[in-house]
Amino acid sequence: MEKTILDHIAIYLFRKFQYTKIMAINMCEPRNFIIGNITKRLMRFANEKMIADSVDRLNVIKDDVIVEVGSGTGQSLSAIIKNEPKKIFALEISKTFLADLRSNFHDERIEVLGKDAKDLRGFIENETVDKILLINVIYFLDPIKEYLSEFERILKMNGTILITGKFGPASKMDKSVFKNTDLSGLLSILENYFDVSSEFVDLGEPISQYHAIKLTKK
């Protein structure tokens, strides 16, 4: 994706405010008009390669039921739907992103839910989901054990979860917002719920380096 003048301005402003609490909050849930638009613009091009690779790793097959936690700009939804899943639940708590998703996606297989992923009862039944995807979202889930219990509830036996994140950069962000940035500590928690494997992924440039964590329901 070729960067525009506005993209370069967004990068400049991001570097100025990168480690502030207001930037952290808007990376989690865009609110402030200026900062929120900076984060939205950065997400579109800064995660492009990571998102494409994450969707490939999710290995969606025809008639899968998918949950994406934090669908954001919808980049991953556009890629997932090409693999002909039966259903995608796109979860998003940001009002800004939620409005964009509902405006941009009209495929009947995609259900956009403005729900927190720690409680999906009444929306998603027990053991009905094949795969769950979280891209740059795991940092914000607090308390994380409540989310993991809910993922365990909705996931089919031998179903999988793919968590992808840039834990190095995330560890420098405001800790009151970015809660789960210690990779080794996170893996220890995940192992209490699922079979876990982790891989460092280098797609050729620093902005596209990330960790991919695969969880399988025991």
PLM ranges: what are they?
Residues 67, 72-120:
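Class I SAM-dependent methyltransferase SAM/SAH-binding core
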Residues 122-132:
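A short acidic, Gly/Pro-enriched loop at the edge of an enzyme's catalytic core
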Residues 202-218:
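Core SAM-dependent methyltransferase catalytic element
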Residues 175-193:
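Conserved Class I S-adenosyl-L-methionine
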Residues 158-166:
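Conserved beta-strand signature within the Rossmann-like core of class I S-adenosyl-L-methionine
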Residues 35-52:
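Conserved SAM-binding loop and adjacent beta-strand
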Residues 131-144:
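A short SAM/SAH-binding and catalytic strip from SAM-dependent methyltransferases
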